[in-house]
């Protein structure tokens, strides 16, 4: 799992204080409970925010992470000025030898309300 610190949304909007569901330590502990092999926390700063989406795919996803499977939500954006999206990742699947997986959003029904999470939740069985 690749995660960023600070979260890009918080980096670009300094007025956001309570955007997180969990802090970084809690997030890592939750991922460990899901038996994630490793968690990479990348410092998100001005230089990293300037990386073009194609360079992110080539240099981060392919060369550094050597990713074979990439789990993303439909609204996932990346790269300088959020230029990259899921369509672009799919476009490069064959060239860089990875597979995009878009799990269905989690929908929780509670009394008198509906909670919709467009985040990625999966089990080990789903990635085998």
Which positions does each model-derived feature cover?
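Nucleotidyltransferase catalytic core that binds NTPs
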Residues: 1-128
């Amino acid at each position: 799992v690749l995660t960023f610190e600070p979260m890009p949304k918080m980096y670009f909007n300094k007025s956001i204080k309570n955007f997180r569901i969990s802090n970084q330590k809690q997030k890592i502990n939750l991922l460990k409970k899901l038996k994630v092999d490793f968690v990479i926390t990348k410092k998100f700063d001005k230089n990293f925010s300037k990386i073009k989406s194609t360079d992110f795919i080539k240099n981060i996803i392919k060369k550094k992470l050597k990713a074979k499977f990439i789990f993303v939500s439909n609204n996932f954006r990346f790269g300088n000025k959020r230029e990259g999206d899921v369509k672009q990742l799919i476009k490069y699947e064959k060239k860089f030898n990875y597979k995009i997986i878009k799990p269905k959003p989690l929908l929780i029904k509670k009394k008198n309300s509906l909670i919709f999470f467009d985040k990625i939740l999966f089990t080990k069985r789903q990635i085998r």
